[in-house]
Amino acid sequence: MSLRDKLFVTLQYLIPQHALSRLVGILARSEVPWIKTTFINMFMKRFGIDLSEAQIEDADQFPTFNAFFTRALKADARPLEASESNDIASPADGAVSQLGAIRANQVFQAKGHDYSLYDLLGGDSALASEFTNGQFATVYLSPRDYHRVHMPFTGTLRETRYVPGDLFSVNEATANGVPNLFARNERLVCIFDTEQGPMAVILVGAMIVAGIETVFSGQVTPLPKQVVTTDYLRSKPIALEKGEELGRFLLGSTVVMLFPEGKAKFAPNLKPGSQVRVRGKLGAYTNENKH
């Protein structure tokens, strides 16, 4: 790591992560014209935001910064390219951080850093065993990206697990410098049952992420500092189609997907750093090693 990256990571430990995120959340929800306009204009200039694909193309028409940040795209902006029945779709616009095999119960984060399924899934060993020796993919959403998360594959929601934690920034520097980054940051674990077996879609929070929303329960973070499990099989089943919206980040972050052993095969051209677009083909299910 460079000296600059080391200093950046050290600063992450010193900053009051949750207090800063709450403050940003207040500003991001503000409807005061000069506040929301100032933040939107600064953000657009800093990150080169293009609104031509958005349903609302005039930045002045967004009521809050959050509305701007979680803007919807035009219906034809992201066609479903993962159109074959076994195709797995990218859940978001962004860059592949890592992807590949889960070694026993260890998920690769960066050189010299792994984290466990048990920790990632909030301390549930039975749930972790469903993905032992499976496949994973991690997609990082940069500030300029579209920040809604969509379904990689059609499934029925089994449960969600809100796991409290830190709010480290998520980028290459922290992936290389913060052990267990994705298993220590605040996150929402969504478990779906699909025709190919269980699938986990995990929305990982980060510095100044003021919350995570889902289409089935609204805003789910922040919550009390304990794991909160919600069983969705006891109520009316919630089924979401491949490519359908699942949730959104109120600022930043990362999506981690988990698939069972012998089920998922990623596109051979994908590697760390590859750019992906929501509903694009990430890979496909295969039954080559079906047990």
Swiss-Prot record:
One of its GO terms (molecular function) is phosphatidylserine decarboxylase activity. It catalyses: a 1,2-diacyl-sn-glycero-3-phospho-L-serine + H(+) = a 1,2-diacyl-sn-glycero-3-phosphoethanolamine + CO2. It is found in: Cell membrane. It is an enzyme of class 4 (lyase). It is a peripheral membrane protein. GO terms for cellular component: plasma membrane. It comes from the Bacteria. Its cofactor is pyruvate. The modification Pyruvic acid (Ser) is found at residue 253. InterPro entries: PS_Dcarbxylase (IPR003817), PSD-B (IPR033177), PSD_type1_pro (IPR033178). Its EC number is 4.1.1.65. Keywords: Cell membrane, Decarboxylase, Lipid biosynthesis, Lipid metabolism, Lyase, Membrane, Phospholipid biosynthesis, Phospholipid metabolism, Pyruvate, Zymogen. Is synthesized initially as an inactive proenzyme. Formation of the active enzyme involves a self-maturation process in which the active site pyruvoyl group is generated from an internal serine residue via an autocatalytic post-translational modification. Two non-identical subunits are generated from the proenzyme in this reaction, and the pyruvate is formed at the N-terminus of the alpha chain, which is derived from the carboxyl end of the proenzyme. Its main location: membrane. Pathway: Phospholipid metabolism; phosphatidylethanolamine biosynthesis; phosphatidylethanolamine from CDP-diacylglycerol: step 2/2. Binds 1 pyruvoyl group covalently per subunit. GO terms for biological process: phosphatidylethanolamine biosynthetic process. The active site is at residues 93, 150, 253. The record marks 252-253 as: Cleavage (non-hydrolytic). Catalyzes the formation of phosphatidylethanolamine (PtdEtn) from phosphatidylserine (PtdSer). Heterodimer of a large membrane-associated beta subunit and a small pyruvoyl-containing alpha subunit. Belongs to the phosphatidylserine decarboxylase family. PSD-B subfamily. Prokaryotic type I sub-subfamily. HAMAP family: PS_decarb_PSD_B_type1. This is Phosphatidylserine decarboxylase proenzyme.
